[in-house]
């Protein structure tokens, strides 16, 4: 066997060994523990903790925003609930003002209109500083939450050791295209395998932004660091959910996952939008992995395997693919061993997912392997080479809000 063949064989063998160990342990730790969530209120008075729901909004579709706010208004939470909708300098403000007006007479709702676009993170922080609830729930403006989400997340926050908790994400537009169906399965796996396994040790590495609850006392301790995140001396304006989660863990708080708290969010329905989203996520993951490495000595050893599996695994897979392509180009021989290894591992993973979810559609997730090899691996390489780029890609250019309004107008009941 020549050098090229040897390199390919070693790379795919190491990838298979690492993936088997990582995914095997992940599958075990992701199994339900049959422990019931605590049902005692967080506050010592016996009353449920007050909850502030923050909804940052930028150029949102009025229908999506209306559905989001309607789902929040229907929460069955027994405690005090307040809602802060922050319009981050939207250019379509005239179109969404009627949505605001619909809730103008609901005393739970307050609308904050930013005079210009400042970014999701700063919009969040404005609402955090304006509000005062015991717990803070972030909900993206294109996300709808089940009626019991606030209740279930607040129960998970019973212990003062818990700094953050996230719900389970699904794709609200799952039926749109083959891509949205694939992303919906991707979300299920990310939540019910990756996050569920991490939560076994109280260390969910990213409490996803569409539906994540935080303890205010913990937030206030970390707010300055969160607001002033820098990367290579420049402000970092995306990946706020992952960075805030890492800050929580670094401060000694637990981060949890609540699969019963269901949130449905709009996912990209075109390949271009999906790849732009994945590029942002890859950059933020690489950036915050450097911070996460410092946490690993204080966490369970599984989390070390998790970080290695998520970062070294794609590198070994990319090396396997590159050597396979080189073998095909230089020797005109098909790298069957690499192809068969990747295919067999894909089918095993999809089979396990289909069994756990009790849904045969997960067998179709094998298509994601082709997408991963053809597009996502090169995209991750590009992300690694452009870590300093903080462009959101999906955002339009900052738009000034009409009339420079800073707060909501008088309600019209």
UniProtKB/Swiss-Prot annotation:
A GO molecular function term, named singly, is: hyaluronan synthase activity
User: Could you tell me which InterPro entries the record lists for this protein?
Assistant: Chitooligosach_Synthase_NodC (IPR026463), Glyco_trans_2-like (IPR001173), Nucleotide-diphossugar_trans (IPR029044)
GO CC annotations, alphabetized: plasma membrane
Membrane-topology annotation of the record = Peripheral membrane protein
Keyword Glycosyltransferase set for record: yes
Chief location: membrane
* Keywords from the UniProt entry: Cell membrane, Glycosyltransferase, Membrane, Nodulation, Plasmid, Transferase
Q: What is its EC number?
A: 2.4.1.-
Q: Does the keyword Cell membrane apply?
A: yes
SUPFAM superfamilies tied to this protein? Nucleotide-diphospho-sugar transferases
Q: Can you say where in the cell this protein is located? A: Cell membrane
First-tier enzyme category under EC: transferase
- Quote the Pfam families the UniProt record gives: Glycos_transf_2
GO annotations under biological process? extracellular matrix assembly; hyaluronan biosynthetic process
* Entry's family note: Belongs to the NodC/HAS family.
Q: Which PANTHER family match?
A: HYALURONAN SYNTHASE, MANNURONAN SYNTHASE
Function, as annotated, reads: Involved in the synthesis of Nod factor, a sulfated N-acyl-beta-1,4-tetrasaccharide of N-acetylglucosamine which initiates a series of events in the host plant species leading eventually to nodulation.
The protein, known as? N-acetylglucosaminyltransferase
The UniProt gene name for this protein comes to nodC
């Amino acid at each position: 066997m020549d050098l090229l063949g040897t390199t390919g064989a070693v790379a795919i063998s190491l990838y298979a060994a690492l993936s088997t160990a990582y995914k095997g342990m992940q599958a075990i730790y992701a199994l339900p523990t049959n422990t019931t969530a605590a049902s005692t209120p967080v506050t010592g008075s016996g009353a449920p903790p007050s909850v502030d729901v923050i909804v940052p909004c930028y150029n949102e579709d009025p229908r999506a925003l209306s559905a989001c706010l309607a789902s929040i208004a229907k929460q069955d939470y027994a405690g005090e609930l307040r809602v802060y909708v922050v319009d981050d300098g939207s250019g379509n403000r005239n179109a969404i003002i009627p949505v605001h007006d619909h809730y103008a007479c609901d005393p739970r709702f307050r609308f904050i209109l930013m005079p210009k676009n400042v970014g999701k993170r700063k919009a969040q922080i404005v609402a955090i500083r304006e509000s005062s609830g015991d717990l803070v729930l972030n909900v993206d403006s294109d996300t709808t939450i089940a009626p019991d989400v606030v209740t279930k997340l607040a129960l998970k926050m019973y212990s003062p050791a818990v700094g953050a908790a996230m719900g389970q994400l699904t794709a609200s537009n799952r039926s749109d295209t083959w891509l949205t169906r694939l992303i919906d399965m991707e979300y299920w796996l990310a939540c019910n395998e990756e996050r569920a396994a991490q939560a076994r040790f109280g260390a969910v590495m990213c409490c996803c932004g569409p539906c994540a609850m935080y303890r205010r006392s913990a937030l206030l301790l970390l707010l300055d660091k969160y607001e002033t995140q820098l990367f290579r001396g420049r402000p970092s304006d995306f990946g706020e959910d992952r960075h805030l989660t890492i800050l929580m863990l670094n401060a000694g708080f637990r981060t949890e996952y609540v699969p019963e708290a269901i949130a449905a969010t709009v996912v990209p329905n075109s390949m271009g939008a999906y790849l732009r989203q994945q590029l942002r996520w890859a950059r933020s993951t690489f950036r915050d992995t450097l911070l996460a490495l410092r946490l690993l000595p204080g966490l369970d050893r599984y989390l070390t395997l998790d970080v290695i599996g998520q970062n070294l695994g794609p590198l070994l897979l990319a090396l396997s693919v590159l050597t396979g392509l080189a073998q095909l180009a230089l020797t005109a021989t098909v790298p069957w061993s690499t192809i068969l290894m990747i295919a067999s591992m894909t089918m095993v993973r999809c089979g396990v997912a289909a069994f756990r979810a009790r849904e045969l559609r997960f067998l179709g997730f094998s298509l994601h392997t082709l997408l991963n090899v053809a597009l996502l691996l090169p995209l991750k390489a590009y992300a690694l080479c452009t870590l300093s780029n903080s462009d959101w890609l999906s955002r339009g250019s900052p738009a000034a809000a009409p009339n420079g309004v800073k707060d909501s107008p008088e309600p019209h009941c």
